[in-house]
Amino acid sequence: MSVGHKSRASIGNYLADIKNDGLMDVVVVDMMPEREDIRKSSVFADPFNIDYVKQRFGYHFQYRRNTLLLNRGNALKLIPGTNTAFNLFSEIGQLAGIHATDWSWAPLFVDLDNDGHKDLFVSNGIYRRPNDLDYLDHIKKNEVQLELNSRKFQSIPAPI
């Protein structure tokens, strides 16, 4: 499979022929919130330096959003130096408007309205947000800071 980038957490995925062309397409769901304010108050991406190191070690571009990979089966690409070819896929999640369904768990293609076309159903939700940066508001409070300052922490060396 050849794609320009991929979903980062890849929580759930589903294979379906969404165009009825005999080729299996792939949807992968992730955690991008639909609302901009939630995106901005969440730990969302790696810092640039970590992203750069990952790329130097050969990791592919990863984004925390849903991806819809449309199979372009007639566009076979030959791997140089081999006789192996594979299908190319186009990532159309943003074009299809399904890239941000919040903390998503499982996608399902099914004809829900009996119109003959497959609909995408995504189960999503999370109790509280473990990646929310709202703890910064609480740690600024004096009583919390005083409590943290009064504790004795033991220094433990990190294993090598």
Question: Model-derived features: where do they sit?
Answer:
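Acidic, glycine/proline-rich Ca2+-coordinating loop motifs
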Residues: 1-160
